Amino acid sequence: MLTIGTALRPNATRVMLLGSGELGKEVAIECQRLGLEVIAVDRYADAPAMHVAHRSHVINMLDGAALKRLVAQEKPHYIVPEIEAIATDMLVELENMGQKVVPCAQATRLTMNREGIRLLAAETLQLPTSSYRFADTESAFRQAVSEIGYPCIVKPVMSSSGKGQSLIRSEPQLQAAWDYAQQGGRAGSGKVIVEGLVHFDFEITLLTISAVDGIHFCAPIGHRQEDGDYRESWQPQAMSDVAVARAKEIASQVVKALGGYGLFGVELFVCGDEVIFSEVSPRPHDTGMVTLISQNMSEFALHVRAFLGLPIGTIRQYGAAASAVILPELTSHNIAYHGLETALVGDTQIRLFGKPDIAGKRRLGVALAVADDTDTAIEIAKRAASAVVVTGK
């Protein structure tokens, strides 16, 4: 039976977030709802989750020794990674010492780079994926492209939000694609994956929860990507019953193989009744922010329930809903938001993340909407997002 202590008291139940962005902020809020003590960690100060945490720390999370010292200092009951750029070998070591890592250290280690999870899915589980090759030198990269053929996609094995990704259609693009991939990796230059282009009708995120009362699924989430980053997401994504069943089967296999309790964002390509595995994150997914308005429990609430060992019960989906990102482009350490009166009309909500600064394009918030159908919800969310004017000095 779970016992939760009182935050800021000797019997507190402590949760340490490794990564304190907008997703971590919502996880922190859900932890606060249950009286958990929240320690937010990131590589920069004043990150969004730090605004709603009891304490915060700024460290290089790729530094295993620094991470180990902080865990020894704070003694968390749960370590909850929000990002991939973490010293996952240290998480494995800490777990072996009795520390609870969410969902488990193996899941964070395998999914921190595309090689580990692709080998698990394609070779161990024998799931359908795109054709692929790995390369750690420029010559090996060129050979991989020749084997895969054009068009193909190159990605650093360790990157997120589209960083370092390129679509290659012909040989003259190879040098620029290789150079960009080397700049975009989370740990600097290194190995890349070259993937054959998959012809699909649409992409989905299937939020899959592994909990004490079994495997649960949210309704499929559709999304639109631009420059490797999501711009809008919607729920539910219409798809055939056969495709839904296949998607659940694939997601269940992946989640069970990774292990542990928590919510997983399983990314899949859908073409008719055919479903192809793409990627998985062992944590809430950015496209899943639509669940802040579309469900009785958001993906963040589900994640917290699951990793605490609590039953999930019933997930209710309220109908057509959408999210659209607020993505301004400017440079400022003193950001201001205007136009909320125009944005907040009808069935809309706004989330502003509270990021401390911006240099270029940065996702600073999200607009949420519900409507009679997903197309209408998307348009309402996009209008609301565009109504928010961001300025800075």
Curated annotation (Swiss-Prot):
Its EC number is 6.3.1.21. Keywords: ATP-binding, Ligase, Magnesium, Metal-binding, Nucleotide-binding, Purine biosynthesis. The keyword Magnesium applies. Residues 119-308 form the ATP-grasp domain. N(1)-(5-phospho-beta-D-ribosyl)glycinamide binds at residues 22-23, 82, 286, 355, 362-363. It catalyses: N(1)-(5-phospho-beta-D-ribosyl)glycinamide + formate + ATP = N(2)-formyl-N(1)-(5-phospho-beta-D-ribosyl)glycinamide + ADP + phosphate + H(+). Mg(2+) binds at residues 267, 279. Transmembrane segments: none annotated. One of its GO terms (molecular function) is phosphoribosylglycinamide formyltransferase activity. GO terms for biological process: 'de novo' IMP biosynthetic process. Pathway: Purine metabolism; IMP biosynthesis via de novo pathway; N(2)-formyl-N(1)-(5-phospho-D-ribosyl)glycinamide from N(1)-(5-phospho-D-ribosyl)glycinamide (formate route): step 1/1. GO terms for cellular component: cytosol. ATP binds at residues 114, 155, 160-165, 195-198, 203. It comes from the Bacteria. NCBIfam families: PRK09288.1, purT. Involved in the de novo purine biosynthesis. Catalyzes the transfer of formate to 5-phospho-ribosyl-glycinamide (GAR), producing 5-phospho-ribosyl-N-formylglycinamide (FGAR). Formate is provided by PurU via hydrolysis of 10-formyl-tetrahydrofolate. Homodimer. Belongs to the PurK/PurT family. This is Formate-dependent phosphoribosylglycinamide formyltransferase. It comes from Yersinia enterocolitica serotype O:8 / biotype 1B (strain NCTC 13174 / 8081).
